[in-house]
Amino acid sequence: MEVAEVESPLNPSCKIMTFRPSMEEFREFNKYLAYMESKGAHRAGLAKVIPPKEWKPRQCYDDIDNLLIPAPIQQMVTGQSGLFTQYNIQKKAMTVKEFRQLANSGKYCTPRYLDYEDLERKYWKNLTFVAPIYGADINGSIYDEGVDEWNIARLNTVLDVVEEECGISIEGVNTPYLYFGMWKTTFAWHTEDMDLYSINYLHFGEPKSWYAIPPEHGKRLERLAQGFFPSSSQGCDAFLRHKMTLISPSVLKKYGIPFDKITQEAGEFMITFPYGYHAGFNHGFNCAESTNFATVRWIDYGKVAKLCTCRKDMVKISMDIFVRKFQPDRYQLWKQGKDIYTIDHTKPTPASTPEVKAWLQRRRKVRKASRSFQCARSTSKRPKADEEEEVSDEVDGAEVPNPDSVTDDLKVSEKSEAAVKLRNTEASSEEESSASRMQVEQNLSDHIKLSGNSCLSTSVTEDIKTEDDKAYAYRSVPSISSEADDSIPLSSGYEKPEKSDPSELSWPKSPESCSSVAESNGVLTEGEESDVESHGNGLEPGEIPAVPSGERNSFKVPSIAEGENKTSKSWRHPLSRPPARSPMTLVKQQAPSDEELPEVLSIEEEVEETESWAKPLIHLWQTKSPNFAAEQEYNATVARMKPHCAICTLLMPYHKPDSSNEENDARWETKLDEVVTSEGKTKPLIPEMCFIYSEENIEYSPPNAFLEEDGTSLLISCAKCCVRVHASCYGIPSHEICDGWLCARCKRNAWTAECCLCNLRGGALKQTKNNKWAHVMCAVAVPEVRFTNVPERTQIDVGRIPLQRLKLKCIFCRHRVKRVSGACIQCSYGRCPASFHVTCAHAAGVLMEPDDWPYVVNITCFRHKVNPNVKSKACEKVISVGQTVITKHRNTRYYSCRVMAVTSQTFYEVMFDDGSFSRDTFPEDIVSRDCLKLGPPAEGEVVQVKWPDGKLYGAKYFGSNIAHMYQVEFEDGSQIAMKREDIYTLDEELPKRVKARFSTASDMRFEDTFYGADIIQGERKRQRVLSSRFKNEYVADPVYRTFLKSSFQKKCQKRQ
């Protein structure tokens, strides 16, 4: 078998290739992989390998029924129209036998089907029904002991450098994971951690369907996902690594994104290549095994892999050792940040290099004595908390932070009856991951090998790894820090809206000429945008800046027992609940609160406007006579304010409700600094998917039709009305952009045009299908409104608005205008009835943000707007002894009380072997060490913790924290110890829930009031007193009362 040298790339169509090696070819994994890439297999991002018939990884699978799946996950899917979000809920542990019975039961079994195409249709049609259960992330291998060919536990690739040089084991990444699937269990769209290779072998059972997107088109999928899920995208630039996003093939086809699909049968391998996005599902009960690996070609991908920045538990591997060992000629340049390299996705990996050969030779010498030696890794089990602070150790250039994730144990019963616990931290390759502990009976201990060296212990986290990677669960998981390098700017498809600076806001005293504002089509450039795509930008072919050395040595993983460095890759989503609302839901309107509806007299009575947000709109209400000059003045003024686009401003209001009226007035009275006279481009804030509400519109064009390649769009101003918009937001084709450009309204000389969806004039208008006009921002935010022509934002369809919405009254303008018109939107918080016009809410400063499909905009009224800094600032206030404060009494009401003493308590933070976490463990509860005398143990040290149930649990120590407790005394003399966050000073504003239950202590006439515990226990329950009206009818005989009671119960049963 020769590695072909080809000048032109093979496999130009990027189709998934299938290989059938002979036994001789099959013996050398790395050599055959290089051969596959020489044929162009890597261009598809996925390839199938059918091993020789005589090769068997395991002779019999009948003895794994007692294998324990410690943390199965139930996959709940929400969404519609080919766009879905997957949530994972952890279930009780079960054995493989129990799981198989469940998978084959009537509820979860595979439906009848004609062929795989028919089954695929049924999968996408029924995806949101009957949430399946997935047995994922079981750390270990079920290969037989003597199998050396393509043994997933020891592939002997360059990724092994991580464990050999740094002593770090990342479970699921460089150790194998087992996965037990059933019909419809899914692994969502993702690439591997650090964009590594992965290998997946289907041991037995029903097939598995795969979808793959060529690496050279990966960026297109990312942009599409950013458009459909803007909220997730703004929260994390690499949100696809959360493995929660499902996009159907029909949607990919409509957007022209190339993809291919293939079915993996039992006994076949699937290999994914660097930066190859893939997804898929199981046809029924099966068992697969997978892990990650690497080649020399991967190193350049690893340098620029886009990492998840919103969680601490994502895998991040320091590339320093790989560059130093396998790219020594580029090492110094790379350390200096000058190693700029363009990734060629078509280039195959070399069969070998001098550096790889030298490394393999050294490795063989070391491994000769223990070539076939594998032992179980010990792990710790323990409950885990949702949030933990990072604690790290420096180990051979690797930073080992405190695992934020939950670990589960794999227990293997050895013949010596010694139980070995394995921790499952983060899953890595092709299967959805779930933190897992599995128990193997004594007769199984001879057949199941656990990956790892004798000196290393495995860690098992509660993270779930998707089918071919990891999935998300509802619990928090151990954290492998994935923070992006500080020196490399992160760029995302959408920028988080900046808050307008008051100095930029201005309101001219008199209407000015539009020519001064629209002189050059009003374009603005954002100066802070990076010109080079960086570490956070993924694998866009072209720029690959090097990472400075300061960050390269930060391979962060959870610390492991006995000084070994071990971690597992984790892909579970943080605790969150699936959306329970419907985009079309209307909430019955009630009287608005005083907080949201100030009593303001009608402007029509020419009374002076007192609200700062409404002052600039005084001449724009539709009940006033049309005033085109006032519209020009308003449009010209807001064109100078960020975001400079009359449509994007939906997500960045000009008015700041938190500011004083004087501040807001000053912003509008500030003079214009200077008029923009040079063309420029900025990134629109409104994602393209907000314009495409239903899948019906998807066929019109791909997203961002009028965007530049870098995601920016030209800002252009109308020569007459001075409104400024992005070309992409307003739908302006490039051939129409010119000096003197006119908006749709000015082209038709519709000087008196007004929006049919609100009560305000001005802004960017487009014509509706019934020949009226509507603000583009109103059409985006009102759920039932559609753009018939999405790219050009024309032919707005307002005919689907229900009567209930048209009857809603705006809390902002109902006292300013006499008529009820337009269509209101409502707060997205629960069933909040607050309603308002889009432009009224925008002018008043109501927070609106892009939401994930199938929702458009997430709206938060003032009542539900949370300021995260309020509570933290309150907790910073010092409380002293003798101070009068307010806190909760035992009777659940709040009273004034006096601080009698302030004490501090040191708590230890430990992670148990099962992955759970405790932040409030007392030092004396650690029985394996006298912490009161010797002090705390070393970070990462294994300890024994005595739990309140009296049992001892294994755990790892991760740090300590100090909590202050306040002993307070109420007027009735009772005392209680409270934390700072439960105490309010007299000068703090009390939350509503506290105000509602705040009381003033009375005399001791009602003693029971101050003994809530007794009341709850029922010891002081008030006796019932018989009414005088029924004294003559009361029978004291208990036998008679029992007879009546039994007779009554019999009568009730007969009626039922």
Curated annotation (Swiss-Prot):
Record remark on domains: The 2 Tudor domains recognize and bind methylated histones. Double Tudor domain has an interdigitated structure and the unusual fold is required for its ability to bind methylated histone tails.
Residues that hold Fe cation according to the record: H190, E192, H278
Matching Pfam families: JmjC (PF02373), JmjN (PF02375), PHD_2 (PF13831), Tudor_2 (PF18104), zf-HC5HC2H_2 (PF13832)
Acidic residues compositional bias, start-end: 386-397
Annotated protein name in UniProt: Lysine-specific demethylase 4C
Listed GO biological process terms: androgen receptor signaling pathway; blastocyst formation; chromatin remodeling; positive regulation of cell population proliferation; positive regulation of transcription by RNA polymerase II; regulation of androgen receptor signaling pathway; regulation of gene expression; regulation of stem cell differentiation
UniProt cofactor(s): Fe(2+)
Zinc finger boundaries on the chain: C2HC pre-PHD-type: 752-785
Domain Tudor: 877-934, 935-991
Any one GO cellular component localisation term in the record: nucleoplasm
Annotated JmjN domain residues: 16-58
Residues in JmjC domain copies: 144-310
Matching InterPro entries: EPHD, JmjC_dom, JmjN, KDM4-like_Tudor, Tudor, Znf_FYVE_PHD, Znf_PHD, Znf_PHD-finger
Tissue-specific expression: Overexpressed in several esophageal squamous cell carcinomas (ESCs).
Domain of life assignment: Eukaryota
Keywords from the named record: Chromatin regulator, Dioxygenase, Iron, Metal-binding, Nucleus, Oxidoreductase, Repeat, Transcription, Transcription regulation, Zinc, Zinc-finger
Record region (Disordered): 370-414, 423-442, 480-598
Subcellular location(s) of the protein: Nucleus
List of residues binding Zn(2+): C236, H242, C308, C310
